[in-house]
């Protein structure tokens, strides 16, 4: 907890709650925060792990929703956040980066808007924790949800929720805590209030070791290498006739590239990359329906390449060659 609190500048380590993944953390935060009649502002960049809890609360608690639209490059207009605020607005929920285009959101700017209007700011850092700087105090983040198995390099089955002091959530599950056994209610103090049941101790130990590794190597060093690999791939494939690349590559971003080859089905392209070249990609809709609609790729989907610290330039060149051959 102390390592994660330091990593994200969460002022209190006991306000770091362990979860199984980002999806659990997001459900915990969204369902524990919102009341009937609340209004929430989110964006077209959101993953289904944000969208589906919101849609469920829209149906079950009459929570109303507004979305900041994305353009054909996956960009958003920050002024739209303020234009969408109503008297009953409770929170702004925003991903730190699109899992499809890789485009990053200026969460410090959004946090300032939220706090200027007395709103709670929830950030989905699934795509960025471990690769882009996150400072809960400086960026005015009230609730931060993250996963351990992506850029934090930890095991699957790890994640968490960091809460600013003063934020209270209804527990979305209750049960054994190992303390206050004779209390019929869930204990009030964090993290116990939100950690019913046995935690993934082995996974948490692995995540702790991963944080040590990131600190030793340096997050900026990791980010620079991943960005260099991503740029090498982007420059190679964007020059290939018949290839369409999605997203804004002039702005801050993560090391993913989503593309299509002509009108080929994205699943078939991904299968060919795996079977013929040994390249693992993610095709389809990426749990990001609003983003695909914004990009006009709802029918075809897209093929997403993700680049990490352990990839090499030779692997990037192989991937470029594979895309070129499939496009011919």
Q: How would you label these PLM feature ranges?
A:
Residues 1-328:
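Pyridoxal 5′-phosphate
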